[in-house]
Amino acid sequence: MYHVVAATTNPAKIKAISLAFDDVYGPGQYRIEGINVDSGVPLQPIGSTETRTGARQRVSNARQMRPEADFWVGVEAGIEDNMTFAWMVIEHLQWRGESRSASLMLPDIILQGIRQGRELGDEMADLTGISNVKHKGGAIGIFTDGKLTRTSVYHQALLLALVPFNNEIYQRPAQ
């Protein structure tokens, strides 16, 4: 049984990780442990580079805390221009898989608050009255009326990040 360390305690992210590992390895073939680690970036990362750095740093910190694990998974959401998205980073042994999620265009009223230094989740809570949005369906769930959720979008990106561990072509040396 694989020991998967999720570098988060966010239930929406842990659910997405669980769904992806179910799809790739099968239910009951792993156990997920969520741990709280620092991303090394601001609470609301801006730009793809800062967001990806946050996901990588989460994995690095999780590896230091749980070196005996088989997989370490970092998920970091960010804002770039007028879009929200997330980076997924998964490490196993010496390999790494990465993927960027689909992006959602944000309305100007939300972006205004983000430019003033607020987090997307706080802006969404203020505008909708829904508390702790980022631990639920996220902005994606609200704006798509539940047709997509933070979990469903992250699930898809996590499946892509797992590809290098399950396709032998990725493990062949370059010639």
Curated annotation (Swiss-Prot):
It holds the Pfam family NTPase_I-T. It comes from the Bacteria. The lineage of its organism: Bacteria, Pseudomonadati, Pseudomonadota, Gammaproteobacteria, Enterobacterales. Mg(2+) binds at residues 38, 68. It comes from Yersinia enterocolitica serotype O:8 / biotype 1B (strain NCTC 13174 / 8081). It catalyses: XTP + H2O = XDP + phosphate + H(+); ITP + H2O = IDP + phosphate + H(+). Homodimer. It is an enzyme of class 3 (hydrolase). InterPro entries: ITPase-like_fam, Non_canon_purine_NTPase, NTPase/PRRC1, YjjX_NTPase. The keyword Calcium does not apply. Substrate binds at residues 8-13, 68-69. Binds 1 divalent metal cation per subunit; can use either Mg(2+) or Mn(2+). Phosphatase that hydrolyzes non-canonical purine nucleotides such as XTP and ITP to their respective diphosphate derivatives. Probably excludes non-canonical purines from DNA/RNA precursor pool, thus preventing their incorporation into DNA/RNA and avoiding chromosomal lesions. Keywords: Hydrolase, Magnesium, Manganese, Metal-binding, Nucleotide metabolism, Nucleotide-binding. This is Inosine/xanthosine triphosphatase. GO terms for biological process: nucleotide metabolic process; thiamine metabolic process. GO terms for molecular function: ITPase activity; metal ion binding; nucleotide binding; ribonucleoside triphosphate phosphatase activity. Its cofactor is Mg(2+); Mn(2+).
